[in-house]
């Protein structure tokens, strides 16, 4: 048997919102759930290709590690500096 007063409140009619509109009703421990992607607009289920991530992985990597476009991969930017000295 479940112990009393230790379980979270259960909402059997919790509403799921995507882009401000209700897309489905589920059971949850929260009254409202806000999601960015659900099966109705996910590219795998709709068969369409949609870019969800606005910033590419390569650009994010370059920005994170402070690499500029001129340096490129493999440290080619540093080889020119050695030749100049």
From Swiss-Prot:
The keyword Electron transport does not apply. Residues 64-85 are annotated as: Disordered. GO terms for biological process: translation. Disulfide bonds: none annotated. GO terms for molecular function: rRNA binding; structural constituent of ribosome. InterPro entries: Ribosomal_bL28/bL31-like_sf, Ribosomal_bL31, Ribosomal_bL31_A, Ribosomal_bL31_sf. GO terms for cellular component: ribonucleoprotein complex; ribosome. Pfam families: Ribosomal_L31. Transmembrane segments: none annotated. It comes from the Bacteria. The keyword Isomerase does not apply. Keywords: Ribonucleoprotein, Ribosomal protein, RNA-binding, rRNA-binding. Part of the 50S ribosomal subunit. Binds the 23S rRNA. Belongs to the bacterial ribosomal protein bL31 family. Type A subfamily. This is Large ribosomal subunit protein bL31. It comes from Acaryochloris marina (strain MBIC 11017). The lineage of its organism: Bacteria, Bacillati, Cyanobacteriota, Cyanophyceae, Acaryochloridales. The gene is rpmE.
């Amino acid at each position: 048997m479940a112990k009393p007063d230790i379980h979270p409140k259960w909402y059997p009619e919790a509403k799921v919102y995507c882009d401000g509109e209700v897309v489905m009703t589920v059971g949850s421990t929260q009254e409202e759930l806000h999601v960015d992607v659900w099966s109705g607009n996910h590219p795998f289920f709709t068969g369409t290709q949609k870019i969800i991530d606005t910033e590419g992985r390569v650009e994010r990597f370059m920005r994170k590690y402070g690499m500029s476009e001129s340096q490129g991969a493999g440290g080619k930017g540093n080889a020119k500096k050695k030749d100049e000295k």
